[in-house]
Amino acid sequence: MWKDLFVKKKKYAPLPSEQARHEVPEGVMTKCPQCKKIMYTKELIKNLRVCLSCGYHHPMPARERIASLLDDGSFREYDADMISVNPLGFPGYIEKLEEDRRKSGLNEAVVTGEGALDGHPLVIAVMDSSFRMGSMGSVVGEKITRAVERAREQQMPFLIFTASGGARMQEGVLSLMQMAKTSAALKRFSNDGGLFISVMTHPTTGGVSASFASLGDYNFAEPGALIGFAGRRVIEQTVREELPDDFQTAEFLLKHGQLDAVIHRHELKETLAVVLDLHQKGGEEGWWRN
């Protein structure tokens, strides 16, 4: 027994297997699609999901976007429990919606509500491309329309951040009619003098780009955002011409007069606060464009 107490200890420790050494928990690291650099996801989030190496603007979840812009504790969400059904009986659609709800933590591809930005009250809508690629179905269109109507009733500015692949094919014509419905609501809002600010993020395409995304009194975009209706390849085949390398980027649209400004994400809050300052009315008159 005494001999066992003084057994010489081994001078090595077991090494992890080759597979274990290369396994990193999912979500800890993020690879930039532009510069291919790998960075800690926590550091990327701290930097508002702007690449620390090349400045690429990664997609930003809707709730992160709201938290980064609005004053602490000011946000009150609208229509949080509104969810899509399957009006056309499209095979597998309900299952895909449930999967996206589980992965994104959202009930739909847009979050709407009211809050304050640097003390300025407003109504806000933020689309999230992690839910059905931000596609616009009947619920997305309804939530945006209701948000615009509330902004009109309460005489507050309306701010939207778009990120979408276009109309949702699983809902057919019901998704296409949202283009007209949202645009009509914005027309009524504009006729009453309402201030509408649209910020297009990557990507803003299809029926969203062809409707409410482009109707702002101010049309802004983030750097490098893909903005357009049809895809590049479809357009090239139609016009039988090779398109410029920067075609359908935010910078291309700015150069051709379709945007008012391309704004870095780090400067967005300050810029929006300045715009709201310019359009504020005193007393009880509210916040109006005119």
Swiss-Prot record:
EC number(s) on file: 2.1.3.15
Keywords from the UniProt entry: ATP-binding, Cytoplasm, Fatty acid biosynthesis, Fatty acid metabolism, Lipid biosynthesis, Lipid metabolism, Metal-binding, Nucleotide-binding, Transferase, Zinc, Zinc-finger
GO MF entries: acetyl-CoA carboxylase activity; ATP binding; carboxyl- or carbamoyltransferase activity; zinc ion binding
Gene Ontology annotations of biological process type: fatty acid biosynthetic process; malonyl-CoA biosynthetic process
Pfam families linked to this entry: Carboxyl_trans (PF01039), Zn_ribbon_ACC (PF17848)
Reactions accelerated catalytically: N(6)-carboxybiotinyl-L-lysyl-[protein] + acetyl-CoA = N(6)-biotinyl-L-lysyl-[protein] + malonyl-CoA
Obligatory cofactor(s): Zn(2+)
A GO term from the CC aspect: acetyl-CoA carboxylase complex
Co-factor note (free text): Binds 1 zinc ion per subunit.
Compartment(s) where it occurs, according to its Swiss-Prot or TrEMBL record: Cytoplasm
Span of zinc fingers (C4-type): 32-54
Annotated binding of Zn(2+), by residue: C32, C35, C51, C54
Pathway membership, UniProt: Lipid metabolism; malonyl-CoA biosynthesis; malonyl-CoA from acetyl-CoA: step 1/1
InterPro entries to which the protein is assigned, alphabetical: AcCoA_carboxyl_beta, Acetyl_CoA_COase_Trfase_b_su, ClpP/crotonase-like_dom_sf, COA_CT_N, Znf-ACC
UniProt keyword Methyltransferase present: no
Family: Belongs to the AccD/PCCB family.
Quaternary organization: Acetyl-CoA carboxylase is a heterohexamer composed of biotin carboxyl carrier protein (AccB), biotin carboxylase (AccC) and two subunits each of ACCase subunit alpha (AccA) and ACCase subunit beta (AccD).
Function statement: Component of the acetyl coenzyme A carboxylase (ACC) complex. Biotin carboxylase (BC) catalyzes the carboxylation of biotin on its carrier protein (BCCP) and then the CO(2) group is transferred by the transcarboxylase to acetyl-CoA to form malonyl-CoA.
Name listed for the protein in its UniProt record: Acetyl-coenzyme A carboxylase carboxyl transferase subunit beta
Organism: Geobacillus kaustophilus (strain HTA426)
Name of the encoding gene: accD
